[in-house]
């Protein structure tokens, strides 16, 4: 067995594995590597300090070093077993190592690097060994130096320019299927798994499989519930350091990622990437079940759950299950009173930043989402999506209990509670329960007397936005709800419903009167 060397106790990561490590794990790696090196020195084992150790001591990130800096001090071997030296690139685009295998016939031990060798001609001993080594490595570009009894070899791999591409911005590796380009071939290989469906990393807890090992690592925290990253501003904790970094921008308002196409700015690079697809018409991700196509693989994954009906995300508080993790996260806030997002205009606080953004439009009057069919504008994109169904008349959501169909899944969910009698939303003030959170929100205003929906025309204020919308029709004279029986029009659907009921009852009474037999002679005759 040969002398112990630093590489025997070193821990190595691939580029993909390194990116999966969070800050705490990278710090642990740094401490372990430095400790291992210190132990070798303490034991009196002669080793030259690797550049990796110098890098870690200076607090630099290993992956920011140039490739040639990452190679440990060139390994040295006796020429007797130099012919059995082969390169192996096990750490793609980050580290490279040379596997040195001891030749059985070699008698040299404790090899030391003798500096000062400039060329092969200076080496007087073991010329034969050098020639053998040179012959063995004809296929690999190399620089070979021989000094006395020892040979120094530095391998230069063909893809050593990978680091340079990071600075030039070039993306030479393109995937034909979707047209996406990458700087590194290894990243392209990883990306291909999205299209092929290859998911080699499986969770032992729930059986879910992933394309990348780092995705599996992140997923496991769902089962453990571990949240080591805490926000100093609001105390909220997160599973991943990157999520905490993005979250902090909610407090600062920072949006560093800007779209070159439309100028819109975002808090995270992932949100920008998702947004940029809006500007393209490409939809390379297709559902095999129904043929629907999507511009993001994540959207396809989310869509597939519609067909399976799977609800893997369960609330520990009330046992309610959800299809998506983000829906569970949103739901959990029902059980807490946490409202970290506050409106500077009126002081109202919200559980979600998106709700605050939408709320602000009440003050600004902004309605950025416009219907191409009728020109009507909305504050929320979801309201526009909901509105569009009015034009199509489609009702794809059907109740299995009574067969009633609905335009929106949310309406079906609300309707189902009629059959179950479920009323999960309870008023803390009076104890009254409701089957919809929105009704509870509206109900609470009875206790607070709050009326922040104000008519710009006459100044009248309302507790609900729907009441304000109805009221505005008085000023416009709009009467969109028309009775098919008599042609009379109304400004509220509820008034039309009441009107139709009156006509129905009147018609029923007339039918009864016509069908009723006349009294008189027949009755008298019967009496006689």
Curated annotation (Swiss-Prot):
One of its GO terms (molecular function) is DNA-binding transcription factor activity, RNA polymerase II-specific. It is found in: Nucleus. A zinc finger (C2H2-type) spans 173-195, 201-223, 229-251, 257-279, 285-307, 313-335, 341-363, 369-391, 397-419, 425-447, 453-475, 481-503. Residues 4-75 form the KRAB domain. SMART domains: KRAB, ZnF_C2H2. InterPro entries: C2H2-ZF_domain-containing, KRAB, KRAB_dom_sf, Znf_C2H2_sf, Znf_C2H2_type. GO terms for cellular component: nucleus. Keywords: DNA-binding, Metal-binding, Nucleus, Repeat, Transcription, Transcription regulation, Zinc, Zinc-finger. CDD domains: KRAB_A-box. GO terms for biological process: regulation of DNA-templated transcription. May be involved in transcriptional regulation. Belongs to the krueppel C2H2-type zinc-finger protein family. This is Zinc finger protein 626.
């Amino acid at each position: 067995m040969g002398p112990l060397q630093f590489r025997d106790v070193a821990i190595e990561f691939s580029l993909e594995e390194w990116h999966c490590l969070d800050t705490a794990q990278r710090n642990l790696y740094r401490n372990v590597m430095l400790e291992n090196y210190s132990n070798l020195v303490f034991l009196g084992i002669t080793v030259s300090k690797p550049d990796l150790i110098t890098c870690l001591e200076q607090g630099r990130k290993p992956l920011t070093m140039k490739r040639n800096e990452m190679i440990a001090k060139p390994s040295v071997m006796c020429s007797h077993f130099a012919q059995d030296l082969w390169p192996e690139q096990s750490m793609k685009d980050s580290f490279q190592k040379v596997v040195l295998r001891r030749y059985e016939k070699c008698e040299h031990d404790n090899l030391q690097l003798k500096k000062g060798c400039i060329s092969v001609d200076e080496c007087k001993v073991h010329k034969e060994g050098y020639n053998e080594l040179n012959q063995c490595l004809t296929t690999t570009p190399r620089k070979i130096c021989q000094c006395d009894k020892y040979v120094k070899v530095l391998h230069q791999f063909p893809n050593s320019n990978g680091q340079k591409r990071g600075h030039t911005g070039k993306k030479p590796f393109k995937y034909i299927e979707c047209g996406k380009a990458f700087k590194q071939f290894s990243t392209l290989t990883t990306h291909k798994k999205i299209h092929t469906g290859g998911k080699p990393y499986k969770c032992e807890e729930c059986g879910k499989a992933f394309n990348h090992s780092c995705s599996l690592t992140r997923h496991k925290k769902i089962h453990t519930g571990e949240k080591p990253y805490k926000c100093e501003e609001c105390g909220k904790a997160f599973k991943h350091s990157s999520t905490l970094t993005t979250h902090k921008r909610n407090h600062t308002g920072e949006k560093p990622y800007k779209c070159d196409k439309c100028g819109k700015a975002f808090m995270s690079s992932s949100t920008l990437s998702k947004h940029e697809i809006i500007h393209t018409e490409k939809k390379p991700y297709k559902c095999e079940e129904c043929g629907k196509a999507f511009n993001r693989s994540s959207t396809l994954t989310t869509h597939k759950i519609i067909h399976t009906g799977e609800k893997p995300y369960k609330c520990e508080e009330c046992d309610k299950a959800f299809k998506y993790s983000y829906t569970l996260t949103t739901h959990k806030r029902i059980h807490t009173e946490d409202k970290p997002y506050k409106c500077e205009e009126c002081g109202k606080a919200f559980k979600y930043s998106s709700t605050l953004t939408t709320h602000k439009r009440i003050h600004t009057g902004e309605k950025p989402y416009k219907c191409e069919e009728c020109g009507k504008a909305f504050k929320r994109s979801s309201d526009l999506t909901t509105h569009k169904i009015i034009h199509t008349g489609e009702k794809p959501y059907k109740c299995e209990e009574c067969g009633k169909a609905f335009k929106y899944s949310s309406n079906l969910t609300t309707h189902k509670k009629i059959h179950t009698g479920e009323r999960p939303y309870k008023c803390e003030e009076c104890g009254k329960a409701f089957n919809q959170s929105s009704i509870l929100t509206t109900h609470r205003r009875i206790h607070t007397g709050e009326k922040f929906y104000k008519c710009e025309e006459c100044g009248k204020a309302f507790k609900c936005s729907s009441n304000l919308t109805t009221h505005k029709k008085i000023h416009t004279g709009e009467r969109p709800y028309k009775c098919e029986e008599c042609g009379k029009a109304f400004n509220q659907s509820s008034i039309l419903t009441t009107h139709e009921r009156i006509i129905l009852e009147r018609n029923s009474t007339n039918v009864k009167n016509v069908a009723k037999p006349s009294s008189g002679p027949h009755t008298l005759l019967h009496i006689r």
